[in-house]
């Protein structure tokens, strides 16, 4: 399970605060404004596992201990097990996504909760075959909304695909992949018509259009990473960025070349730490790499990083 000590700051930064500052010479971070929102401002819990910006512009925050919080820029609305009006299955939420019908899907070890972002109520999605009830009761740790409009759920060592009709009712629930017992899919990244996943000792892919169980297929020998604990996969143009517990990898899909970035105690422009918790791209196409010791802004011109953490604030 990923540990996101700085993820909340990262996604607040992503949401709307990458406005250019005047006088951008100097450090890369001087182009941006930063803010921090903590429990002092009403955040229910400082341990955040995921953040989602919904189609209406609100932030939904998955916490490890206090359920889900929706942030409107001014205050938080909380959803948790102790809420008498909207009761969640668990206070320990792993991941969030929004479907095409303005519903938030939240996965946890206790199953799946579905929230309507307009009514702010939990909802029961119509499923003629009643497969969703069974799936919602299974422990789940990962969820993805694909470009085709499907929901992908990782539950234990299985990957399920949920398709919908035009009204938003369940059309089909298909088990598309099963990994060996004791293993789990920790990350999914959509790349064109495929979903790239961590599998065995590297990264493999499955077809998004799959309607039956399929074996993940080999991509490249460069993506075989024995001994590497892959945490996150992120695509930027023709490159795949891979965050792991052993540093950051950057894979070029055209040349199949791989570069490995690691923390160097003698180089302040290296990563701040080797355990990568998340990777994201700003609206200005800057890559952000979150570690257990802060955020790293990637400078494509110099092929190195500028560190942002709670102590420096303005980088180092």
Give, region by region, the residue ranges found by the protein language model.
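Carboxylate-rich, polar loop motifs that coordinate divalent cations or form catalytic acidic clusters
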Residues: 1-316
């Amino acid at each position: 399970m990923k540990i996101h000590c700085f993820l909340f700051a990262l996604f607040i930064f992503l949401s709307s605060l990458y406005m250019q500052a005047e006088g951008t010479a100097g450090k890369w971070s001087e182009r941006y404004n930063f803010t921090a929102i903590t429990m002092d401002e009403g955040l229910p819990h400082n341990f955040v596992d995921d953040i989602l910006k919904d189609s209406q512009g609100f932030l939904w925050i998955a916490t490890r201990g206090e359920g889900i919080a929706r942030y409107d820029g001014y205050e938080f609305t909380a959803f948790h097990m102790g809420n008498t009006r909207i009761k969640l299955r668990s206070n320990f939420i792993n991941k969030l996504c929004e479907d095409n019908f303005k519903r938030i899907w939240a996965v946890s070890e206790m199953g799946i909760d579905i929230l309507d972002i307009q009514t702010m109520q939990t909802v029961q999605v119509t499923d003629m075959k009643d497969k969703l009830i069974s799936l919602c009761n299974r422990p789940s740790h990962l969820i993805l909304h694909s470009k085709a409009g499907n929901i992908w759920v990782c539950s234990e060592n299985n990957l399920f695909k949920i398709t919908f009709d035009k009204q938003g009712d369940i059309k089909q629930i298909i088990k598309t992949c099963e990994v060996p017992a004791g293993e789990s899919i920790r990350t999914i990244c959509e790349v064109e018509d495929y979903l790239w996943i961590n599998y065995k000792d590297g990264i493999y892919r499955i077809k998004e259009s799959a309607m039956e169980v399929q074996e993940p297929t080999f991509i490249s020998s460069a993506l075989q990473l024995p001994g590497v604990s892959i945490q996150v996969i992120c695509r930027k143009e023709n490159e795949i960025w891979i965050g792991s517990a052993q540093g950051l990898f950057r894979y070029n899909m055209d040349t199949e070349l791989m570069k490995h970035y690691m923390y160097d105690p003698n180089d302040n422009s290296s990563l701040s730490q080797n355990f990568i918790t998340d990777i994201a791209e700003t609206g200005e196409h800057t890559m952000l790499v979150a570690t257990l010791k802060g955020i790293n802004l990637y400078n494509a011109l110099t092929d190195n990083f500028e560190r942002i953490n709670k102590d420096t604030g303005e980088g180092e």
